[in-house]
């Protein structure tokens, strides 16, 4: 199974790239974590935010391979504990499909992305900067994998 993190934004600070890559490299080959970056629309004083969000959504949906299980990262989503995420990860593996996790930009996800999602995951009730979300998602998925495989990374 492949995990795809599809996120709005391209030029991330080095600490974000290093943090994400640290967890990305820890995944086994049979559960690779891939990052697909979607260029953020230009935002300015007179920007049409609705149109920008729509275009970002179209690009995100176009990046999802046909048949993937889609998980949106959004506030109204399910707030999983680590064991619950580990259970979800196991179910995704048993389902036999790759998984695409969608992270929006500053205004969140386009309605089309929310509608296309099979599940919605809320990382926190806090507002998190979307660059940091990449690292939190990668670490959380790695921790869930470690729970499922009895790897010593996760300790109760």
UniProtKB/Swiss-Prot annotation:
- A molecular-function term among this protein's GO annotations: rRNA (pseudouridine-N3-)-methyltransferase activity
InterPro entries per record:
Alpha/beta_knot_MTases (IPR029028), RlmH-like (IPR003742), tRNA_m1G_MTases_N (IPR029026)
Residues that, per the record, bind S-adenosyl-L-methionine: 73, 104, 123-128
- Where is this protein primarily located? cytoplasm
> What SUPFAM superfamilies does this protein's entry cite?
alpha/beta knot (SSF75217)
Question: Per its UniProt record, what HAMAP family does this chain match?
Answer: 23SrRNA_methyltr_H (MF_00658)
Share what the entry says about its subunit structure, partners included. Answer: Homodimer.
Family recorded in the similarity comment: Belongs to the RNA methyltransferase RlmH family.
This one is known as Ribosomal RNA large subunit methyltransferase H
Which species expresses this protein natively? Shewanella sp. (strain W3-18-1)
Q: Which gene encodes it?
A: rlmH
